[in-house]
């Protein structure tokens, strides 16, 4: 084996932890909306609000998690602490089947754990390489592929266990997965001795009457309690408003920092891409909420007498991303060798167009359900797969553009703003959209009178909304192409 080309041993422990983190997170996420409506008997409106609040806040806490890792904990300790908190959160969530009061606390613990983990796992991987190490890109590709494996397997495994045993066992499996990843990671501790550890000097220094380790303990207790209150009082939207306002102030500061017209143009492009990405993900995140309940209520899931658990359908999207990503990488390689390139706006138009096509298929499925009572499973799988393929033309394109910006020291900040808007705000908007399908008519026996027309209307509106975005993006693409050709002709003349 060529030692120059082989990856450092530590990466395999990071990859194992990433697989199990994705397994834990996406296994629980596949069950959550179904658990709220089918087990805890929340009405759709309440379930959508809580689900979107949870999915929004997991994109806000990594900002604080990254800060704590940089200043005090170091990436390795932050990742381990985050993994432990997520495992505890999933176990407490399982207990909420018996004691529903634990629900908000469990979600808050998971959000805090995710904040410590998500922002620092990539940074930990980066510490394994020198800045110019040619193996770096391969290591990050391996980490991304590993995550997809976890997100494919998780809904299948957790969905099966929940269906065959109980909701608590389904959530417990997610917790066991996270603990398994943590144990594997700890077994490779000797390979991480060169990475940044806990900053003991800062940790032991005193600030405002207490040593910093005391403030850290207070934060670890207070943060879950504060987020619990946000869930309980439905105040998470205020946290998003504050975070967004701060981001806009920071964005304005970056704009003033730009010294050339080229830099301002690049920043304007990133902002525009971020806004379209936010809309894209507001549509795409229906997969965990309104689409999941639609599948549960109106799709025929029987195969040879076996009823496929609804949660398993969450694997379709992840599988499509992984499979189509390999195909797309080959096609792009071929197009580059033939001197053919795809413009940024062309890719965004294609991604939004595929999202529109996916929801068009779901609209057909919903109309089929309206006519015949239930829709076919293959049609549903096709729609989800097309939506998964669409993702490949959005985030990678936007993130690539962010890393190219020529303003020193702003890449990390812009990435955080992008994740806030396309993650947190998009998930909040997704909840607003999903709420249009809410089913609130309970009869005396407690059964719900599900109205298929609500799903038909929402899926159709998203189809046209995504198509309208395609139209706007194509206009931008045509304008940019015209400007480029005009400039080229002017140079030739």
Curated annotation (Swiss-Prot):
PANTHER family: PROTON-DEPENDENT OLIGOPEPTIDE FAMILY TRANSPORT PROTEIN (PTHR23517:SF15), RESISTANCE PROTEIN MDTM, PUTATIVE-RELATED-RELATED (PTHR23517). Its main location: membrane. SUPFAM superfamilies: MFS general substrate transporter (SSF103473). Probable proton-dependent permease that transports dipeptides. It comes from the Bacteria. It is a multi-pass membrane protein. One of its GO terms (biological process) is protein transport. GO terms for molecular function: dipeptide transmembrane transporter activity; peptide:proton symporter activity. The lineage of its organism: Bacteria, Pseudomonadati, Pseudomonadota, Gammaproteobacteria, Enterobacterales. Belongs to the major facilitator superfamily. Proton-dependent oligopeptide transporter (POT/PTR) (TC 2.A.17) family. DtpD subfamily. Keywords: Cell inner membrane, Cell membrane, Membrane, Peptide transport, Protein transport, Transmembrane, Transmembrane helix, Transport. InterPro entries: AA/pep_transptr_DtpD, Dipep/tripep_permease, MFS_dom, MFS_trans_sf, MFS_Transporters, POT_fam, PTR2_symporter_CS. This is Dipeptide permease D. It holds the Pfam family PTR2. The gene is dtpD. CDD domains: MFS_DtpA_like (cd17346). The chain crosses the membrane at residues 14-34, 49-69, 91-111, 138-158, 167-187, 212-232, 235-255, 267-287, 312-332, 344-364, 379-399, 413-433, 458-478. One of its GO terms (cellular component) is plasma membrane. It is found in: Cell inner membrane.
């Amino acid at each position: 084996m060529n030692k120059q080309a082989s990856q450092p041993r530590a990466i395999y422990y990071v990859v194992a932890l990433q697989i199990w983190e994705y397994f834990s997170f996406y296994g629980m996420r596949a069950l959550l909306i179904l658990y709220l409506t089918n087990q805890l008997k929340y009405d759709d409106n309440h379930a959508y609000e809580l689900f979107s609040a949870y999915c929004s806040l997991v994109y806000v806490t990594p900002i604080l998690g990254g800060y704590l890792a940089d200043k005090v904990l170091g990436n390795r300790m932050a990742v381990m602490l985050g993994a432990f908190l997520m495992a505890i959160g999933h176990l407490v969530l399982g207990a909420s089947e018996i004691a529903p009061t634990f629900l908000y606390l469990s979600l808050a613990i998971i959000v805090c754990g995710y904040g410590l983990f998500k922002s620092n796992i990539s940074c930990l991987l980066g510490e394994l390489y020198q800045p110019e190490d040619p193996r770096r890109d391969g290591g990050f590709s391996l980490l991304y592929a590993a995550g997809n494996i976890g997100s494919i397997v998780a809904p299948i495994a957790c969905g099966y266990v929940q269906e065959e045993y109980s909701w608590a066992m389904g959530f417990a499996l997610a917790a066991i997965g996270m603990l398994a990843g943590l144990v594997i990671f700890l077994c490779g501790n000797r390979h991480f001795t060169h990475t940044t550890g806990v900053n003991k000097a800062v940790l032991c220094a005193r600030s405002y009457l207490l040593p910093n380790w005391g403030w850290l303990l207070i934060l670890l207790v207070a943060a879950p309690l504060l987020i619990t209150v946000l869930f309980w009082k439905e105040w998470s939207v205020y946290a998003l408003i504050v975070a967004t306002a701060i981001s806009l102030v920071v964005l304005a500061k970056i704009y003033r920092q730009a010294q050339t017209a080229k830099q301002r143009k690049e920043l304007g492009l990133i902002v525009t891409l971020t806004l379209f990405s936010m809309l894209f993900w507001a549509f795409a995140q229906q997969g965990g909420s309104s689409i999941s309940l639609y599948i549960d209520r109106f799709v025929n899931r029987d195969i040879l007498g076996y009823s496929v658990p609804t949660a398993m359908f969450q694997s379709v999207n992840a599988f499509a991303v992984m499979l189509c990503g390999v195909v797309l990488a080959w096609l792009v390689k071929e197009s580059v060798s033939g001197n053919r390139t795809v413009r940024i706006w062309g890719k965004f138009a294609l991604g939004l167009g595929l999202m529109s096509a996916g929801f068009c298929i779901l609209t057909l499925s919903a109309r089929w359900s309206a006519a015949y009572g239930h829709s076919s499973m293959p049609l549903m799988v096709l729609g989800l797969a097309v939506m998964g393929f669409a993702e490949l033309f959005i985030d990678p394109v936007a993130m690539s553009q962010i890393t190219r910006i020529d303003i020193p020291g702003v890449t990390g900040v812009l990435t955080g703003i992008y994740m806030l808007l396309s993650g947190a705000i998009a998930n909040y908007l997704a909840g607003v959209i999903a709420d249009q399908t809410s089913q609130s008519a309970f009869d005396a026996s407690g059964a719900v009178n599900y109205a298929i027309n609500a799903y038909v209307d929402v899926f159709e509106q998203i189809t046209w909304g995504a198509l309208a975005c395609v139209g706007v993006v194509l206009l931008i693409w045509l304008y940019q192409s015209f400007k480029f050709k005009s400039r080229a002709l002017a140079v030739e003349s």
